[in-house]
């Protein structure tokens, strides 16, 4: 499996990286994402940098972007109070609160986060972004990419921005609020009719 992933991310034009950027978050859901440390260590030993870590970072950041879109779009205070810190946590590389607490709960935000991660990973691959160490992703991952910080920041913006915009436009509808509004309108119409 790991050899297959190594082969995949080595495909030209960032094709494999795009795929792995999309599928990284599902491996977090499955709980097997720590296996990628072997890829990091292998690439560090062979090339002096790891090209895998930026892909994982893009995927994590994107889930944060999707979660923040939900946080800003919802009027449900319970969801908002959970989504805001979860988005920040994801941007620091810890995605479980965002994925399990928000994005998977609503489904589409998770998918939009995967798409955002794919585009961020594609950019990282095309620009040859590599990290000089392993162990930290998200905002603090830039400390491992000081050889090319501008590309890391652009990758962050692309992954986060794509996931945020896609979730805002297509990935989340504040259904609870809509249902309450429709319910109030229905009661109002009924009262008017009875009068």
Where are these regions (language model features)?
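Membrane-interface elements of multi-pass transporters and channels
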Residues: 4-8, 12, 30-34, 47, ...
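Membrane-interfacial loop-to-helix junctions in multi-pass transporters
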Residues: 5-19, 30, 49-55, 75, ...
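Juxtamembrane interface elements at the cytosolic ends of transmembrane helices
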Residues: 1, 35-37, 166
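Residue-level signature of the transmembrane alpha-helical core
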Residues: 18, 22, 26, 57, ...
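Helix-loop-helix junctions within the multi-pass membrane cores of secondary transporters/permeases
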Residues: 37-116
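Hydrophobic alpha-helical segments of integral membrane proteins
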Residues: 1-12, 22-26, 40-44
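Alpha-helical scaffold segments in soluble metabolic enzymes
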Residues: 3, 67, 164-168
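Transmembrane alpha-helical segments and their short flanking loops
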Residues: 11, 39, 85, 97-195
């Amino acid at each position: 499996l790991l050899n297959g992933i190594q082969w995949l991310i080595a495909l030209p034009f960032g094709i494999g990286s795009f795929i792995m950027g999309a599928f990284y978050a599902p491996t977090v859901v499955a709980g097997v994402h720590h296996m990628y440390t072997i890829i990091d260590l292998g690439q560090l030993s062979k090339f002096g940098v790891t090209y895998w870590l930026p892909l994982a970072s893009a995927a994590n950041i994107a889930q944060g972007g999707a979660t923040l879109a939900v946080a800003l779009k919802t009027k449900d205070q319970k969801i908002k109070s959970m989504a805001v810190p979860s988005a920040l946590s994801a941007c620091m590389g810890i995605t479980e609160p965002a994925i399990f607490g928000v994005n998977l709960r609503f489904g589409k935000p998770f998918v939009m986060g995967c798409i955002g991660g794919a585009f961020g990973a594609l950019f990282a691959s095309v620009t040859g972004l590599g990290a000089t160490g392993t162990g930290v992703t998200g905002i603090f991952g830039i400390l491992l990419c000081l050889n090319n910080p501008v590309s890391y920041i652009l990758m962050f913006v692309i992954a986060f921005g794509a996931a945020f915009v896609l979730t805002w436009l297509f990935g989340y509808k504040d259904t609870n609020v809509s249902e309450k509004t429709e319910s109030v309108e229905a009661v109002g119409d009924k009262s008017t009719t009875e009068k």
